[in-house]
Amino acid sequence: MGIIASAVAFAALAAPSGASAAAAPSDVASGFWARSQIVWSVDQGWMGTLSDGRFRPGALATRAAAARVLAHANQRVNNVPFQPDAFTQAVTAGWITAGDGPRGAITQLEFDRAIVRILGIGSSARKLNTLRAADGWRPRLPRGFGAEQAVRQAGGRYNAPAGADDSETWPSSQLERTHLAVQAYQLGHLSGWWRSAVTNQEAVTSALPAYTPLKKQVLGFAIRYAGAPYIWGGTSASPQTLFGTRVQGGFDCSGFVWWVLKLQTYTLADGTTWSGDAQIAWRTTYDMSAHVPFAKRIARADLRPGDILFWSSNPKGRLTDSSTIYHTGIYLGNGWTINSHGSGAGVTLDYMGDGAGWFHDAFAFGWRVLPKGR
């Protein structure tokens, strides 16, 4: 299935240093996946507890609680004094709307758009929404595409561990208090180079080449799911049962490739159809790569849009040992890929050309399943 070990500007979802010094809320178990982030958020005053000391991790976050996190983030990023009436501050500043009032719920997308405003990356988000190919073709972008991509590049999102996949969020999901606490921690620990990561992302808006009719369908379909959560073992945008547990829709890296290139049938204007079902018979990243004959492995310089990509812990081009392959994605062209990975908290568009760090250095080879000329 595969997972990226590094690569982008995301604070690791590991135990925050010094977090153990503060006491955890009484209803946050010692083994809870976000315990350290909750402890940090409460200890730093970014979030609060009830009068009895409970945190209520599974409860929906209120707009007032979200505003409090945003006000602290604004203080951290922009050196603006924190205002106790954070809800009024957030509404007045235009970070969020009043909605159903301070006790109302807030969606992931509205919160992420507020982060975009506070970080001052609105122009990047708006530019990302102009994504188009060289011939003027524009894919149908998911709602909030620019904001969700920008926030991920900045480091404002996270990926829950496999055992907590039921807590992952789509942009339309209502935030729970656990999600809010983890994002508070992310915002309190942004990397020193998050601005350049977001600015560099803008280049994709003018990077896509002209596509054939089939590639417009295939890659347009893939882009439609940008922002979907990373779900270990996930192969569907709909709720799915994985390892005996019912979780929401989402994809791991090979699951996204499987969803786009194997499970779909694409119909062209002339009535002809195409599906990669017969060619892609292996579900995991390792199995996919292991069944690609050496003669069909594609070097970086020969990649074409729609090719399946593989990354390795010991890349040696077409001679890479498949046992070292641990990530996969789909090539968009001109050095860009669309892929689902934990470091990006789901499906993102990423640059893999010169200077791209891990995405460039760990690339092994590609595999072509789309028919030539289509």
Specify the residue positions occupied by each region the protein language model found.
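Secretory targeting and sorting signals
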Residues: 1-21
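Feature responds to low-complexity, polar/acidic, surface-exposed segments characteristic
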Residues: 15-35, 48-149, 158-177, 187-212, ...
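Glycine-rich, acidic and aromatic/proline-enriched surface loops and short helix-turn segments
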Residues: 40, 72-76, 116-121, 149-154, ...
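Phosphate/pyrophosphate-binding loop motifs in nucleotide- or prenyl diphosphate-using proteins
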Residues: 45
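Active-site-proximal alpha-helical segments within enzyme catalytic domains
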Residues: 66-69, 111-118, 180-187, 250-263, ...
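N-terminal capping segments
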Residues: 200-270, 322-324, 338
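...with weaker cross-activation on analogous glycine-rich loops/strands in unrelated enzymes
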Residues: 216-219, 266-349
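Low-complexity, Gly/Ser/Thr/Pro-rich intrinsically disordered linker/tail segments
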Residues: 359-374
